[in-house]
Amino acid sequence: MSYEVLESRKTYEGKIVTITVDKLRMPDGSEAYRETVIRKKNAAGVLAVDTDGRLLFVRQYRHPFREMLLEIPAGVIEEGESGEAAVLRELEEETGKRAGRAEFLCELYPSVGFCTEKIQLFFATELTAGTQKLDADEFVEIEKYTLEEAIAMIHKGE
């Protein structure tokens, strides 16, 4: 099966994303259009477990949904930075915890139908006190849950 990009038009370029509309030739010879959100930087997230066996989460406002959402600590991978270095940095910036160990778990493609974003996922342990360094426009609440509590929250849609 082959797909051919016949033309590509940039419709928006911002700080975080670029949006393109591409005209494609489909495998049957027909033509179709596809919108693509191109992330300028990929991201990394971390499942961090404290010494009491609880998972660390951050709750923060996410404007597209206009509500506070519970998330794992995560952030963009800066130019020249590894995914592991990014999660160690983000974990400390968001939660004030340093990880002695971070293990790569997998790479996720959360919205493959229209977005190029890739997220590297890590598992971190051996947490010690660090220094929380939030961005000026970043306000987070740190929450800790056991694995069982986190799974129950997922099942309840929380």
Set out the residue ranges of the language-model regions.
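Extended interaction-bearing regions that mediate binding to partners or small molecules
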Residues: 1-13
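Nudix hydrolase/Nudix homology domain
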Residues: 3, 30, 68, 79, ...
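Acidic, metal-coordinating catalytic segment for phosphate/diphosphate chemistry
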Residues: 11-45, 51
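Active-site-adjacent beta-strand/loop module that shapes the phosphate/pyrophosphate-binding cleft
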Residues: 23-28, 108-130
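Conserved Nudix-box catalytic region and its N-terminal flanking loop in Nudix hydrolases
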Residues: 40, 45-89, 127-132
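Short aromatic/basic micro-patch
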Residues: 71, 121, 144
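Beta-rich strand-turn-strand
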Residues: 81-86, 94-101
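Acidic/glycine-rich phosphate/pyrophosphate-binding loops and surrounding catalytic core
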Residues: 98, 102-111
